[in-house]
Amino acid sequence: MNSDLTSFDKIEQKIGGSRKISNYIIGGMLTIGGIGFLLASISSYTGRDLLPLGNPSTLLFIPQGIIMGAYGVIANLLNFYLWYLVYINFGSGSNYFDKSSKSVEIKRKGLFKDVEVKLNFDEIKSVKLDISEGFNPRRRIALVLKGRKKPLPLSGAGELKPLLQVEEEGARLAKFLDVNLEGLK
């Protein structure tokens, strides 16, 4: 969540989506692996080597060739899905806070349509810092809304910022919205 303070009564934060280095690396590996398994399967069926490495034409089509073909199909299906998410930049968006109109706009790119949430300042109970360490650490800022059990996350999924930066952004947002800050221990 990049805080771009445009003026004293407005805050706009840009949220990154699925266009991350890790998704490009995993997508590339899935592409190469999926095509490789499919070519190995086709090589075992036709008896011709379609891969420059190894000798897949000597593999028996049943069961090795069929299994490699299934792995190739599964890898390519996952591959197309991941590249589609990267193409649409799934999860990207913005948070817009306007003090003069006392409104909050949260926009995110969804899988098939965009999600847009509009709130008034009086619907916000507090700003919550959701911090958990361990194997799968999480450091995110969320809005606790009146009449809703689950907080509304503001930070992007998979963002792991330094703890001090998350605390400062949460405190700045709570002060801007004139609400309490939860989650500090």
UniProtKB/Swiss-Prot annotation:
The keyword Nucleus does not apply. It holds the Pfam family Ycf4. It is found in: Cellular thylakoid membrane. Keywords: Membrane, Photosynthesis, Thylakoid, Transmembrane, Transmembrane helix. One of its GO terms (biological process) is photosynthesis. It is a multi-pass membrane protein. The chain crosses the membrane at residues 24-44, 66-86. One of its GO terms (cellular component) is plasma membrane-derived thylakoid membrane. InterPro entries: PSI_Ycf4_assembly. It comes from the Bacteria. NCBIfam families: PRK02542.1. Seems to be required for the assembly of the photosystem I complex. Belongs to the Ycf4 family. This is Photosystem I assembly protein Ycf4. It comes from Prochlorococcus marinus (strain AS9601). The gene is ycf4.
